[in-house]
Amino acid sequence: MEKGPVRAPAEKPRGARCSNGFPERDPPRPGPSRPAEKPPRPEAKSAQPADGWKGERPRSEEDNELNLPNLAAAYSSILSSLGENPQRQGLLKTPWRAASAMQFFTKGYQETISDVLNDAIFDEDHDEMVIVKDIDMFSMCEHHLVPFVGKVHIGYLPNKQVLGLSKLARIVEIYSRRLQVQERLTKQIAVAITEALRPAGVGVVVEATHMCMVMRGVQKMNSKTVTSTMLGVFREDPKTREEFLTLIRS
């Protein structure tokens, strides 16, 4: 039986599509299998130095002068958006006053812990607890830009070095005069003291009233928020922690 001429298979037209609507692809050619490449791991971000006691200064006096007009203009826009007239007599200077006040409320951005502690760490063979309590604290809630106010209690167990007592209050001032949440503020104070002195332990307790709870939202006038950070023996030894908590309540 005679065979007719062998015909090559008809080529599929370009752009031909499968029944699922996607373009057809040629089958993969055989070859050595390769392990699937793993996506590169994202590089770990280095810790920001601004939280440590040697952190950089986020803002300077020159920044204040340069940014004051823009900040005042922003407050003027806020007044207009509230339905007020920034040009009426009682509000003419309000944008500038508010801008200057906000720079003061956040002046902690202009200082670092190393500025404060430079000459105030002393060698001293004292191995009993040091406590400074009832340090007044004023800060700004970063969520609503309204104040929260209260008191800070600090205790540490020295390790051959002590800190000038007023410097503990200065540490509180630097970190509280920023846009904050109370939990972070409490930890920053404790970590700064730990990094500066390397004591056997540090305990910090913050009690505060938040205007965002008093003036808005649930409007609870007498509520207080209490946060604590315990490091070193204050965290590991229940007796040391209890002694600290008892002394700040006395």
Swiss-Prot record:
One of its GO terms (molecular function) is protein homodimerization activity. In epidermis, expressed predominantly in basal undifferentiated keratinocytes and in some but not all melanocytes (at protein level). PROSITE patterns: GTP_CYCLOHYDROL_1_1 (PS00859), GTP_CYCLOHYDROL_1_2 (PS00860). Relatively stable at high temperatures. Retains 50% of its activity after incubation at 70 degrees Celsius for 15 minutes. GTP shows a positive allosteric effect, and tetrahydrobiopterin inhibits the enzyme activity. Zinc is required for catalytic activity. Inhibited by Mg(2+). It catalyses: GTP + H2O = 7,8-dihydroneopterin 3'-triphosphate + formate + H(+). Toroid-shaped homodecamer, composed of a dimer of pentamers. The inactive isoforms also form decamers and may possibly be incorporated into GCH1 heterodecamers, decreasing enzyme stability and activity. Interacts with AHSA1 and GCHFR/GFRP. It is linked to Hyperphenylalaninemia, BH4-deficient, B: A disease characterized by malignant hyperphenylalaninemia due to tetrahydrobiopterin deficiency, and defective neurotransmission due to depletion of the neurotransmitters dopamine and serotonin. The principal symptoms include: psychomotor retardation, tonicity disorders, convulsions, drowsiness, irritability, abnormal movements, hyperthermia, hypersalivation, and difficulty swallowing. Some patients may present a phenotype of intermediate severity between severe hyperphenylalaninemia and mild dystonia. This is GTP cyclohydrolase 1. It comes from Homo sapiens (Human). The gene is GCH1.
